[in-house]
A protein has these predicted regions:
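Short runs of predominantly hydrophobic/aromatic residues within well-ordered alpha helices
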Residues: 20, 24, 190, 194, ...
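Intrinsically disordered, low-complexity terminal tails and inter-domain linkers enriched
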Residues: 55-75, 176-181, 305-318
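Conserved aromatic-histidine-acidic binding/catalytic patches
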Residues: 31, 108-112, 130, 181-185, ...
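N-terminal cysteine/histidine-rich coordination modules
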Residues: 1-102, 108-117, 121-166
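Extended, compositionally biased low-complexity polar/Lys-Gly-rich tracts
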Residues: 62-97, 105, 117, 187-194, ...
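Alpha-helical structural motif
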Residues: 35-39, 138, 189, 193, ...
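Hydrophobic, aromatic-lined core segments that form the binding pocket/scaffold
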Residues: 205-383
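Charged, amphipathic alpha-helical linkers/stalks
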Residues: 144-242
Length: 383
């Protein structure tokens, strides 16, 4: 008899609802909207709604294809192949052609929700199916999701400890006393590590940057010290070990100049924007931001400031010093978003640190940890 997978969801999940035309942006613009094969087959038999540009109300399917160059023969003609997948062909403004001016979907208005592709039906929902359970989360690309994270700390159900939620107050001192909900031995340690990282990122006595660094260093050490046991994981996340790690990180940070960190962030921003700019995506947002970033790079080169110098020594004396003053002002203002950013990062860890495809081929424990180390780096880069 087949056992149904247990569904695991954060506490905010069921509170989500699409705000449709009230959305300040739209999820129907400037990204690859995939169309699955089943939907594409159905779309070949459905002609565009009357509200589509160039599609006259009185036209039949045959008339549409013959008389109007702007109206597609069927819904499938509004798709194309890109990077090996079928996607909706966006218009010149990188918007979905089915998106109306009121930010509502012409297809839904004409045919109902069942006409949509799997991507449009599920977004911003994300589902990860593991061998013994299923994890549902929401992606941060939706403003309605961000609103759910703004004012309240979110919690995540435990897949390792029975009847437990993971918040900043959760600590576990004897893992062996709890029932493991994950059946496969090689997967248990990965989920246990994830739960400790979630708790660490929820600890408001530790800065976000410190929590990210500590999580990354612990993952690296665990990767180097195979095999992993529950006792070893507990030791690495114990208050004593964390305090030693924080002391070491503080000492290391004192040897790194403020400029080195700032300059690296500025260069990273420009690197991350390359592919988007190449495809002409998010131009209204990225163009002024990257122009400013390039200007800052020129300031440092023009002022002759090099990595290793103390930015405080230049305070207010030149362009670079004035920039540094503005940077500190920004950091102070940015601090007000810390609760939201903690929720964002903890959701990223829950949804992206462990991916189902990394467990499908019965991998070695070392492979699991290697994937987790790489995923942790991507999560930190996003922050």
């Amino acid at each position: 008899m087949k056992t149904e997978r247990k569904k695991i969801r954060p506490d905010y999940y069921d509170k989500f609802s699409c705000i449709a035309g009230q959305c300040p942006i739209t999820c129907c613009q400037e990204w690859k909207i995939a169309v699955d094969a089943d939907t594409n087959r159905r779309w070949k038999k459905v002609f565009p709604p009357d509200t589509m540009p160039g599609c006259a109300k009185s036209q039949s399917l045959d008339q549409v294809s013959g008389d109007s160059k702007n109206c597609g023969k069927n819904l499938s003609t509004y798709t194309c192949m890109k990077d090996g997948i079928r996607v909706i062909r966006l218009d010149e403004e990188h918007r979905c052609p089915f998106l109306a001016k009121d930010k509502l979907c012409r297809l839904v208005l004409a045919y109902g929700d069942s006409i949509l592709s799997e991507t449009c039906t599920t977004f911003p929902r994300e589902v990860h199916r593991f061998a013994d359970h299923e994890e549902d989360t929401l992606m941060p690309g939706c403003p309605a999701v961000i609103d759910l994270w703004r004012h309240k700390e979110i919690t995540f159900p435990s897949v390792v400890h029975s009847n437990a939620d993971i918040s900043s107050e959760n600590t576990w001192t004897n893992v062996s006393e709890h029932t493991m909900c994950v059946e496969k031995d090689e997967n248990k340690m990965a989920f246990l590590i994830r739960e400790h990282i979630l708790a660490l990122l929820g600890d408001h006595t530790v800065s976000i940057e410190e929590a990210l660094l500590e999580s990354f260093y612990i993952l690296l050490e665990l990767y180097k010290n195979q095999p992993i046991t529950p006792e070893l994981v507990e030791e690495y996340f114990s208050p004593e070990t964390l305090q030693q790690l924080r002391t070491a990180i503080t000492q290391a940070k004192s040897t790194i100049s403020s400029l080195e960190t700032w300059e690296e962030c500025n260069e990273l921003l420009q690197d991350l924007a390359v592919n988007y700019r190449k495809e002409g995506l998010y131009e209204k947002f990225l163009t002024p931001v990257i122009t400013q970033a390039e200007y800052y790079s020129q300031i440092f080169g023009r002022q002759g400031i090099h990595v290793g110098e103390d930015m405080d020594a230049t305070k207010g004396e030149n362009e670079a010093g004035q920039l540094w003053d503005r940077w500190r002002q920004f950091r102070n203002a940015f601090a007000s978003y810390e609760p939201l950013l903690r929720n964002f990062l903890r959701n990223e860890v829950f949804s992206d640190l462990i991916l189902p495809e990394n467990f499908e081929t019965e991998p070695e424990e070392a492979d699991n940890l290697e994937h987790m180390v790489l995923q942790m780096q991507w999560i930190a880069i996003a922050y």
